[in-house]
Amino acid sequence: RARGGADGTDGDASLAPGGAGIRLPRRNEALAAAGLAMRNLGDIDRQSVAGAISTGTHGTGARLGGLATQVRGVRVVGADGEVREASPAHEPGLFEVSRLGLGVTGILSAVTLEVVPAFLLRAQEEPWPLDRVLERLGTPDDPDGLVGGNDHFEFYWFPHTRRALTKRNNRLAPDEEAVELERLRTTGPGPVARARTWVAEELLSTGAGELVQRRATAVPRGPPRRRA
């Protein structure tokens, strides 16, 4: 239980203690049941809580930190078997090293996370010309730029082309959430939308991408040369 318990929250609704060995999907399910969520996550959620924070897993968003920044307390089992509790107020040195330490201080058996009320994200994925992306990146303080104007922004450049795939994720305002939740309850995604999602995420992003990478590994070649 200490290693893998899917605890909810303690008396403070913003703090969620739990076993460090629990996988992120189970932790997120437990939080969602309480109307809560982690502030930021990485692209994948197959890791344990301890593994994700100890190795510096991060998501996107110029105003958001990695998973380690959400940690507010740890329980560490040292090589000698000693169990120590650490937080910003108690043994802060051990706390800082342990929350992003690759296990050098010992095994994390419990982690307390700072969480937020559950929220919805609106996702927009569009192909853009690379020049347009670079021109509009901006800085974290620029609300009109792609970086500062979105909660989460990332782009993937296709080598040897001038095209990029942009991804923007933004939290919905409470009134927008209510409208979106009602729409999902009454209609849900239609068959066309489900088919489009499957083609984009499974067939193209995963299946076709894997085939291209395997082909490139088996038959490598140099980058294309531009004609003078």
Residue positions per predicted region:
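Noncatalytic alpha-helical scaffold of FAD-dependent oxidoreductases
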Residues: 1-228
